[in-house]
Regions:
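Extracellular glycan-recognition regions
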Residues: 1-146
């Protein structure tokens, strides 16, 4: 389970034909309600997303779930430069902030509006991944960390 303030590190190797993969954070126990940091090799991008995206309103035009993701939460990433389709990730969670670092060369930050859900895990869509060297560090408020 995730504390409100923690750091997660891992190495992810993906199959060359994988559509998308990533890490789900602040998830409910069914992994269907939370935040996702998603790698999309075909589109050469990394995306921060959440599900459900917004609450459905009274009228049909209030539905916001047909957007593929929040465009402002996308970063370009050149997957062709990777050696053996491997990425090193570091996620820092600090209450309502999630920050993803990829290979110490790219950062993506998002605000989370529900940091009480404690579950997290890795996922893949249409492909396969190997996750290794998984470490979670619990950070106590007021302490320095490196």
């Amino acid at each position: 389970e995730m504390n409100s303030t923690c750091m997660i590190e891992a190495k992810i190797e993906y199959d060359g034909n994988t559509r998308s993969f990533g890490i789900g954070l602040r998830q409910d126990n069914s992994f269907s309600n939370g935040y996702y940091l998603r790698f999309e090799p075909f589109y050469n991008r990394v995306v921060a997303d959440m599900w459900p995206r917004c609450i459905q309103g009274v009228n049909q035009w209030y539905v916001d779930g047909d957007k593929p993701f929040m465009v402002e939460l996308e970063r370009p990433f050149d997957y062709r430069s990777l050696e053996n389709n491997k990425v090193d990730i570091r996620v820092i969670a600090d209450d309502t902030i999630l920050c993803l670092y990829v290979n110490d060369s790219m950062a993506l930050t998002m605000r989370v509006y529900n940091n009480e859900r404690p579950f997290w895990g890795f996922f893949v869509n249409d492909g396969s991944i190997k996750v290794s060297d998984i470490c979670m560090y619990h950070i106590c408020k007021g302490e320095n960390y490196v």
